[in-house]
């Protein structure tokens, strides 16, 4: 039996017995015991941190220098790819981070985008690209909205002026855009899973590159992150998980309970010490030894180790360690010295298994207007860097999101059983407005759409009337819960699906293309869509009145069209399954669904200007369909065109299914669907996206003329 001294500070100055075979020397133990005095290292590193904190130069942002014109960036100007960073000194790396932050502020001020998250990871981005060798080493950015500094350092700086614009750079990481974007993102909580897959694939291929998954900014509230960590701990493949902890749970309007506690010198020094290679390798050996001992000795060693981890890393390490990840932290995510030191140690340590580095950052770091804002400038329009003022265009109408919130508040005023649920998107869904009025009846579950849906199902079981407000594209994340926990049990949960259809600059990851297709196939679901903001009020009232089955409705991003709203913002419940005719015409009928009705009305004006008066109808419901309306249109017109801002398999498919079974296609009727094309449409302006999708009024009018054999007129309306 040999004695191994763990010389931790304070109460951990104790001797722990560890079994070893005296006949077999253990050079790792002896080298570490004789060459490492932890208390001495601790005090030494504490002194180093204190000295360093007194010599750090003020950054451009801390000096109050913000530029309406492009700021001077002499070091960034020399960096085209990460390889150009490798010979920079630590002082130059700090200046690089300052310049990178200023450059990010300037670029986003011209394009708009996700600013706060990118500012929070500047130092981390510099450290990662300095220590690791991308693209051979895989660096994954969860969600991807914090990837702007990464894009600047990986050959895309000159294109930053095209960010989120048509044919420009994406606002998230995108595999087809750069080899440095090893995994495409846009939704949260995916990178640990993807990174683990890459790590296992690397091992099976016999390679030795590093895999680093950066996750945080609210993404750790999603179950997939924990599923991935659980599997990572079991598979024990080498990978690094960096927890970017900016205390952000809800996006983009969460406010903090108080200031983020500072990551002090003690935590910094101990975290660097814990990443020390001899200590980690010792723990690997000790782990194997204690497994052989068994019994009380094993339990004692485990308790001492657990307490040591608590002393070294502060709070929060137990969960990650229990999942099988070696925990290091918390680390100051804005201290390049510490980040580089720890990343180098972790990279060079020859031990197996996943490592989690807990990095504490501040969203909006280095830009006071972002730091002071409640939303940390999570997503911004174009703005003046010198004042922080955003150039938001004045609109005569409010957004559909706001109209939905007002409609739901009006319903909740009259019905105390109405409650609201959202998944970390209070501002994005308008539920922050509902929260102000009904603080005990609004539930933010974090980025956890699966839980949100089943939580709403439980509320419905108790007689409440839940409205679950989730973006259309995020509803995809909870589809099994919609089917199994809601529709199968016929529970009256109401799904408000914002951002339906094309969404402009956010691109295909946020495009609400598929909700009608995957909702309308469910046997018990009522599926609705308003054609304007007044209809939205009526459909919210309709959903509140449907209490014997689930229902859903979609509405677009953007502002209303300016129609008169219902008195008192209180909608009137519609007859379920009944549409309406808006314009009476002949020969041709345009049957629109949702906001596409407005495109149909505009197309009708184009056709009328060329002598063709067409019928325009608003379906209102995809399920149940207004069969009487469809029969009437089919029998009284030569051509029926269904128009929707959704994918194949949606509203038009349900219409033609009914018409085929009803025999309405057995005669001379010509039916044509206009839907989103069967491909993902890249980010761009709403007008450009609509044109690419073939859903402009001119496209609809040209389709009508082509069906009628009037090809010349079709060409003319497109020019």
UniProtKB/Swiss-Prot annotation:
Binding site for Mg(2+): 217, 246
Annotated localization: Plastid, Chloroplast
UniProt GO cellular component terms: chloroplast
Entry's cofactor comment: Binds 1 Mg(2+) ion per subunit. Binds 1 thiamine pyrophosphate per subunit.
Domain of life: Eukaryota
A Pfam family: DXP_synthase_N
Record's catalysed reaction(s): D-glyceraldehyde 3-phosphate + pyruvate + H(+) = 1-deoxy-D-xylulose 5-phosphate + CO2
Claim: Transit peptide is one of the keywords in the record: yes
Binding, thiamine diphosphate: 145, 186-188, 218-219, 246, 367, 449
Signal sequence coordinates: none
SUPFAM superfamilies (alphabetical): Thiamin diphosphate-binding fold (THDP-binding), TK C-terminal domain-like
BP-aspect Gene Ontology terms: 1-deoxy-D-xylulose 5-phosphate biosynthetic process; glyceraldehyde-3-phosphate metabolic process; terpenoid biosynthetic process; thiamine biosynthetic process
Cofactor: Mg(2+); thiamine diphosphate
GO molecular function: 1-deoxy-D-xylulose-5-phosphate synthase activity; metal ion binding
Record-listed E.C. numbers: 2.2.1.7
Enzyme superclass (EC): transferase
Keywords: Chloroplast, Isoprene biosynthesis, Magnesium, Metal-binding, Plastid, Thiamine biosynthesis, Thiamine pyrophosphate, Transferase, Transit peptide
Transit peptide: 1-57
Stored HAMAP family: DXP_synth
Family that this chain belongs to: Belongs to the transketolase family. DXPS subfamily.
Functional description taken from the UniProt entry: Catalyzes the acyloin condensation reaction between C atoms 2 and 3 of pyruvate and glyceraldehyde 3-phosphate to yield 1-deoxy-D-xylulose-5-phosphate (DXP).
Subunit-level organization: Homodimer.
Name used for this protein in its record: Probable 1-deoxy-D-xylulose-5-phosphate synthase, chloroplastic
């Amino acid at each position: 039996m040999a004695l191994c001294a763990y010389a931790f500070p304070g109460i951990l100055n104790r001797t722990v017995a560890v079994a070893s075979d005296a006949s077999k020397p253990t050079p790792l133990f002896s080298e570490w015991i004789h060459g490492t005095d932890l208390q001495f290292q601790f005090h030494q590193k504490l002194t180093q941190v204190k000295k360093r904190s007194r010599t750090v130069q003020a950054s451009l942002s801390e000096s109050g220098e913000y530029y309406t014109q492009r700021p001077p960036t002499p070091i960034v100007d020399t960096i085209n790819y990460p390889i150009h960073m490798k010979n920079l000194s630590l002082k130059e790396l700090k200046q690089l981070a300052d310049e990178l932050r200023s450059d990010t502020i300037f670029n986003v001020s011209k394009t708009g985008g996700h600013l706060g998250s990118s500012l929070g990871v500047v130092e981390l981005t510099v450290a990662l690209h300095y220590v690791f060798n991308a693209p051979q080493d895989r660096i994954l950015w969860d969600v991807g909205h914090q990837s702007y500094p990464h894009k600047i350092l990986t050959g895309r700086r000159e294109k930053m002026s095209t960010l989120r614009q048509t044919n420009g750079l994406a606002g998230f990481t995108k595999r087809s855009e750069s080899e440095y974007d090893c995994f495409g993102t846009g939704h949260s909580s995916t990178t640990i899973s993807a990174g683990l897959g890459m790590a296992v694939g690397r091992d099976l291929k016999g390679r030795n590159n590093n895999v680093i998954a950066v996750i945080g900014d609210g993404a750790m509230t999603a179950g997939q992150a924990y599923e991935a960590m659980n599997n990572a701990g079991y598979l024990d493949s080498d990978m690094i998980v960096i927890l970017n902890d900016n205390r952000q749970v809800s996006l983009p309007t969460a406010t903090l309970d108080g200031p983020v506690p500072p990551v002090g010198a003690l935590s910094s020094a101990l975290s660097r010490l814990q990443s020390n290679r001899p200590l980690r390798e010792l723990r690997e050996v000790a782990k194997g030894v204690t497994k052989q001992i068994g019994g009380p000795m094993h339990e004692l060693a485990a308790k001492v180790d657990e307490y040591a981890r608590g002393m070294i890393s502060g709070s929060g390490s137990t969960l990650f360690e229990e999942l099988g990840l070696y925990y290091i932290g918390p680390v100051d995510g804005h201290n390049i010295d510490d980040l580089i030191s720890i990343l180098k140690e972790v990279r060079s340590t020859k031990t197996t298994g996943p490592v989690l580095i807990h990095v504490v950052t501040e969203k909006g770091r280095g830009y006071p207007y972002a730091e002071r804002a409640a939303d940390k400038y999570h997503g911004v329009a174009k703005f003046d860097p010198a004042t922080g003022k955003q150039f938001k265009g004045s609109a005569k109408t409010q957004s559909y999101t706001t109209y939905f919130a007002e409609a739901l508040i009006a319903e909740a005023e009259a019905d105390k059983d109405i409650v609201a649920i959202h998944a970390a998107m209070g501002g994005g869904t308008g539920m922050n407005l509902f929260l102000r009025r009904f603080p005990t009846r609004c539930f933010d579950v974090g980025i956890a759409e699966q839980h949100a849906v089943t939580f709403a199902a439980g509320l419905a079981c108790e007689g409440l009337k839940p409205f679950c407000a989730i973006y259309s594209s995020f509803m995809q994340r909870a589809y099994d819960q919609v089917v199994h926990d809601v529709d199968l049990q016929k529970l009256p949960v109401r799904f408000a699906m914002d951002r339906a259809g094309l969404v402009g600059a956010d691109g295909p990851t946020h495009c609400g293309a598929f909700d009608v297709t995957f909702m309308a196939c469910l046997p018990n679901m009522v599926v609705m869509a308003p054609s304007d903001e007044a209809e939205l009020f009526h459909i919210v009232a309709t959903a509140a009145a449907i209490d014997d089955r689930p229902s859903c409705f979609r509405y677009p991003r953007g502002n209303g069209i300016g129609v008169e709203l219902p008195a008192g913002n209180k909608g009137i419940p519609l007859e379920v399954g009944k549409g309406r005719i808006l314009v009476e015409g002949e020969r041709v009928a345009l049957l629109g669904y949702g906001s596409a009705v407005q495109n149909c009305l505009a197309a009708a004006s184009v056709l009328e200007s060329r002598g063709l008066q067409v019928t325009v109808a608003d379906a209102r419901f995809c399920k149940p369909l207004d069969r009487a309306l469809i029969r009437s249109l089919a029998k009284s017109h030569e051509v029926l065109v269904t128009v929707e801002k959704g994918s194949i398999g949606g509203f038009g498919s349900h219409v033609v299914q009914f018409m085929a079974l009803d025999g309405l296609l057995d005669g001379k009727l010509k039916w044509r669907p206009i839907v989103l094309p069967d491909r993902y449409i890249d980010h761009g302006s709403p007008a450009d996206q609509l044109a690419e999708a073939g859903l402009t009024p001119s496209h609809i009018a040209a389709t009508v003329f082509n069906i009628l054999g009037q090809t010349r007129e079709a060409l003319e309306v497109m020019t």
